[in-house]
Amino acid sequence: MRNPNSAAANAAGVVSRPRRALSASGVAGLAGLGLAHVAVAAEADAAAPVATAPATAETNEVAGVSINAKRVADPSSSKFTAPLVDTPKSVTVIPSKIIEQTAATSLTDILRTSPGITFGAGEGGQPLADRPFIRGSSSGNNIFVDGVRDSGGQTREIFNLEQVEVVKGPDSAYSGRGSGGGSINLSSKTPKAESFARGSVGVGTDEYIRATADLNHAFNDNVAVRVNVLGTQGNTPGRKAVDFSRWGVAPSLAVGLNGDTQLTLSYYHLDTDQTPDYGIPLTTKTTQPRTASGILAVDRRSFYGIESRDYQKTKSDIATFAIDHAISDDLNVRQVVRYSKSLNDYIVTNPGDGGAAQFVQGQWWMKRGTKTRWNPTKTIAAVSDIHGKKTFLGLENSFDVGIELSREENLNATYSTFTTSGSACPTGFTIAAATLTSLGAGDCTLVYAPNDKDAWTGVINRSPAARNVAKTAAIYGFDTIKFSDKLLLNLGLRHDSYDSAGVDVATTQANGVFTSVTYTPRKGSWEFTNYQAGLVYKPTESSSLYVSYGTSSTPPGISGGDQNSNTSTGTGNLATSQLIPEDSESFEAGAKANVFNNTLALSGAVFKTTRQNAQILVGPGANDYAQVGEVEVKGFELGFSGNLTPKWQVFGGYTYMDSELVRGAITISNGTVVANVNQGDPLANTPKHSFSSFSTYRVTRAISLGGGAYYVSKSFGGNQGGAGGGANKIYAPSYWRYDAFASWTISPKVDLQLNVQNLTDERYIARTNGVHHADPAPGRQAILTFNVKY
């Protein structure tokens, strides 16, 4: 895997440079550090007298209802002014226990347990990063860490997560600007007023190794420090030459844990180095008979990249200062200040972007194309709020009022990748003149037997970077008004002042050298106000019925689904006009309940979401653009979480989504206006049916068995606003996936866990952009994890 360093990024000439792999000894070293600490502490713990107190049961809030558990899983945000069972909105909290038992390591793994969420493919102007779709809308720009927006396209890790919280439906009252589908909050681990240590070492097939340590030391009742450490590496199961290496550290300090004022300092660092993978080609790139899905029937392991050139390196650093002060028993103030930076840097082979495949000398050949990005971001954010409970006009009010200020800066550049010497194209293979100028000759590979070991020498230069600075100033308020024990009113309001300014860059290049650069300054300012309102009726103390309404605003650029774009103007006659934000609104009605003596949480909701004001072509002229595009998603979802019996745990749900491109851009054929070929089709990355269930059963005091079952129906390829798989009707076929789980508690401090992911080695497509490529999901993998704790 090659990686040009920053000093040489603008210098011509390439030398193959292997990536920095985190060696097995390095991972083992991290494991040894963590486990040695655990072992020493456990020995000291056994030798020293310890004061103990009876364990107390706490209440989990999962999918909006309470279940008995050892760890609280309430959303961490004070914007939730009522328990989730009394919150009139679809909210799912995925607790640490589910994260651990499923052996999740990424955001994709975690969100698999929550039906109705899919992931979009890179390309089409989108970064190679986490791109979750919630209820038909790209929500990559709506990912938060501890309530503060986590800007930039990234691939996230879970080693420092306590839980993941998913809000579904338009929620700009909660989160500000967004795509209308919902938001995801990653809740970090924080210091506790008790000392403990946990260490894990996992080994598995496909050269998988992972070591983590979670060390918490309480100096006294008020001061504690916690450190989480990660080292991992391996290969992607079922994919040739796709490997990864990651390491991270997350220290935090808390002062005043049991006092009226608590101060928390935390830092998070993650470093990744991996082979990027754009999957397999589509049949549209050949004249072969089309498969039903439009995805070429090649071996699942087929990898079209070049091991010596392709790379992806990401970095993430987050420093946070937070202070909470209890003015009284019913009133608290909070201040959070965050500085973060990230980098997403890659060169990836796109198997369908170098031109159509050609049948030459009795075999199918293709010329490789590339997608590249160099995208550093910096964010400074501050959030202040006051929350509590007061009686006004004889009614109990639980409220949260706050302000939010942020400045987000990102640079976005690309690399030239001009081949001077590479795998030869066969005699008779034709290359377009423009492709010869931009990519060079050679760099061909067989469609049905690609060779990732092909040599490559060429010119890599980084282009001048586009720059954007987005500033947000917002004020918000939430209130839950208690009219009686049976009737509650939940209200939310947020007003945003959002400014975006920057410079766009257009370049031309020949033979890998950028020959001209055009800079175009732009800026835009928007004011938008969003609301939410919900009425809750409680038949019993542990159940609720509700109806709710919510809105969302999506500024231009973000409406395209790109985490890093803030375009302000449009196309054609809208090129000199500031576009208005797209607006989303949602109606929802649902029910939540605790059953079986509050050990099982059940929830259900019906919803309808509409997004309007997308820019589309409406007439035959070049200036016939208008913001009248519209999409709609309606459906229902069911959720369950908790215990069917004291030994049987379940977590999962089912989502049905009936999505539609209500009005899309017209097309022009021989001067005649033709309706959008996909109008009326289902939206991209929005399967009609999705189901997930993860369940474990304690067979004996020491042995637990279980597993997961996941179903996703046919899902069309494309990006935000796309539908029906585009003109080529490309889709990812439906699939069932099964996982297996087993654990053995050797002692109260030691256990073994076995996970077999994709148990039947199901060959399925995780996502497709509908234009160039489709991404196969990982194949079967077995992981054995050794856990120690005290």
Residue ranges and their predicted role:
Residues 2-4, 711-721, 743-790:
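C-terminal beta-signal and adjacent terminal beta-strands/loops
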Residues 232-237, 249-256, 260-326, 342-377, ...:
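Acidic/polar loop-and-plug regions of large Gram-negative outer-membrane beta-barrel proteins
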Residues 324-338, 342-348, 545-546, 578-665, ...:
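Membrane-embedded beta-barrel scaffold of Gram-negative outer-membrane proteins
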